[in-house]
Amino acid sequence: MRQETRFKFNAYLSRVAELNGIDAGDVSKKFTVEPSVTQTLMNTMQESSDFLTRINIVPVSEMKGEKIGIGVTGSIASTTDTAGGTERQPKDFSKLASNKYECDQINFDFYIRYKTLDLWARYQDFQLRIRNAIIKRQSLDFIMAGFNGVKRAETSDRSSNPMLQDVAVGWLQKYRNEAPARVMSKVTDEEGRTTSEVIRVGKGGDYASLDALVMDATNNLIEPWYQEDPDLVVIVGRQLLADKYFPIVNKEQDNSEMLAADVIISQKRIGNLPAVRVPYFPADAMLITKLENLSIYYMDDSHRRVIEENPKLDRVENYESMNIDYVVEDYAAGCLVEKIKVGDFSTPAKATAEPGA
């Protein structure tokens, strides 16, 4: 590490210590991040991603408890004949069918090599570059685990699960576990026998088009009071709709430079719903829901951190952890359709023998 880099890096460590009310020398020992610092970090992370701004990132004080129930569940309009002594009954619109959450520890550990710090030290925004590098990767990992996580292993294996499948139970797996009746992954006949292990869309398939599939799923897997909700969207995998339907609609910033424009909205609607593409969503699936129906809960005093140098490997190591849970606020407000295969499934015409053959 160059002398200029050392000076700026020490100033960064002093700033981290100041924000968390500890001595600069204690940054290399595990410390609890101040809740206000965690809140600022989570807000900044949310603002760094268009997708994360559209969902809920919620601090909770307990490791486990009842969902907050963000958004109204069902209708609340009613009539009551009070003249006959009947009292009006208010509806608890936060009452949910499956209403529990449980935050578990997720680690965000990484290192920065000395030569990278030496490069960043040439710029005035040295501390900002370190912070932004952390926030960008954490933002992407929150999204990746949310859409691909199927379990929480005691010790995760990134080589076997490159999409963070074993880090946490994400939103899609929550649907599979908690609301399997709202998940479509195969085709059955009227007697419940499986006729296809995948959902075929196209000529000769189970559905003539993606529009027909979305309309059928919406009508049969989502509760009636949500079917006409103006905030419903279809989060669609990249294999299902051609790239030409997804021009970038965010004109305020350059998508090639900023993570914030990571939600791409199609000009084409599917089943009369806006089609949305987000990072790391499974390529052969669709999630029909309101984006505000998806939440990340984090325990606000669970944030732990330690920053230490490892000169034997010429790098600075940052160990960070937080207890979080991926939450679907109301399963009735959405459904998951997966194992979708688009193509031509019509029976090939039999070859005819040529005359004289």
From Swiss-Prot:
Signal peptide: none annotated. It is found in: Virion. It comes from the Viruses. One of its GO terms (cellular component) is viral capsid. Keywords: Capsid protein, Late protein, Virion. Its main location: virion. N*, H1 and H2 all derive from full-length N protein by N-terminal processing. It holds the Pfam family Phage_cap_P2. Residues 1-9 form a propeptide. InterPro entries: Phage_P2_GpN (IPR006441). Belongs to the P2-like viruses major capsid protein family. P2 proheads and capsids consist primarily of N*, a 36.7 kDa protein and two minor components, H1 (39 kDa) and H2 (38.6 kDa). This is Capsid proteins. It comes from Escherichia phage P2 (Bacteriophage P2).
